[in-house]
Amino acid sequence: MKILWLSGNPALYKRKSMIDGGWIGTLQAEIVKRGLDLAIAFPYPSDDSPSDGDGVHYFPLYVSKWEKRLNKLNKEKIDEHYIQLIKNVIEDYQPDVIHCWGSELCFGLIAQYTDIPVVMHIQGIINPIYDAYCPAGMSGYSILKSLNFNFRKFYNLYYGWHSWMPYQARREAEIFKNTHYFFGRTDWDRHVTKMLSPNAEYFFCSEALRPAIIKSEKWQYHAQKKKVLITSTTSSPVYKGADIILKTAKLLTENTNIEFEWNVYGVSEIRMQERFTGIKCKAVNVYCQGTINADQLADRLLHSDVYMHPSYIDNSPNSVCEAQYIGLPVVAQGVGGVPTLLKDGAGVLVPSNDAYQAAYFIQKIATNQAFAEQLSKKEIEISKDRHDVDVIIDSIMNVYHKIVKNGTK
């Protein structure tokens, strides 16, 4: 059986080691052990020829910078170029199943141009993310003002929401309409799939975690620590909730006696959110630490006391899954697919934009050992089964066989 992955991530292509390819690389390394004939096609910044390595066939998809610039306002043209490249790969490789990773990319459009069955592996879903992109009280003008009227930053941040995401949402709706098979892992993505593709076949499949997380020791309550360490991992889009971090930290600073340090990974600064909220990071013990690797993150999680996930919309954030796997107590906003991850007491859910309850439960976890250990135990119990890589690969392989047996798109 020949399987073609269409991915925005090059997985293990030209990676220095087998642990550098993120969770898709983790899955690649394990699934080839099953003897699967696997090819991966992915966007790449240089015009590399197809090659074999790591037990797979690699097909880099190259679109030149000048063409991207020339067609910056003609997004359909870029999509057409990628689809043609994918058609060429299909003609060359002749797969039995095409496995597309992520509906936010154009690759899922290929279902309209081939008789080979396509299964979409849902990651985030653009349509509901677009609806929740701006936090309450935030607008184009408030973003511009919070950026100190820096129009270049405003263009990069707000224009992406105002122009690019609506196009992505329309394209994604078309992809869902023309795709029959879907992998998902939360109640939320299953419900959204049924709305956008009513006749779809939906298969549950969890995500593999990075080796550094899987190999990590498990978290233990730090009874003797004087300073509480709070950890969050985020990125630059405003819907990721950096403003909630600042609001929650302010409440902890002004209304509790706990001494804390809140380390935020994935970003080097959140100045726009500082101006929007009127809260300075240093004034409320928040420190942006930039990007770190998986080994460093595992160590930080192990030595933290609470993980806080502030996003206004998400499906199944790997950052939450990684904290849970290690056993670090999680507080998260109950949005999108997050409630599925934190079900049955495997963490604490708070309403969206509710810094008060977030602060309350952070304080409770930091000061109530029994409560913290109860959360940790449940997280470890659920995560062990959810992220078992053998179970995940069995699920994927079974679906591949079912799709081939069905013999339909």
What is each PLM-predicted segment?
Residues T233, E261-R275, G290:
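Glycosyltransferase donor-sugar binding loop
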Residues L4, Y221-K240, L246-A249:
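Conserved donor-binding/catalytic core segment of Leloir-type glycosyltransferases
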Residues P329-A332, L349:
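Short hydrophobic beta-strand element within catalytic cores of glycosyltransferases
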Residues Y312:
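Aromatic "clamp/platform" in nucleotide-sugar-dependent glycosyltransferases that forms part
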Residues D344, V348-A355, K364-Q369:
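Conserved acidic donor-binding segment of nucleotide-sugar-dependent glycosyltransferases
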Residues Q273-D295:
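Nucleotide-activated donor-binding/catalytic signature segment of Leloir-type glycosyltransferases, i.e.
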Residues M1-D48, V56:
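N-terminal subdomain of nucleotide-sugar transferases
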Residues T26, S142-F182, H191, M195:
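Membrane-proximal helix-turn-helix segments that form the acceptor-binding/catalytic region
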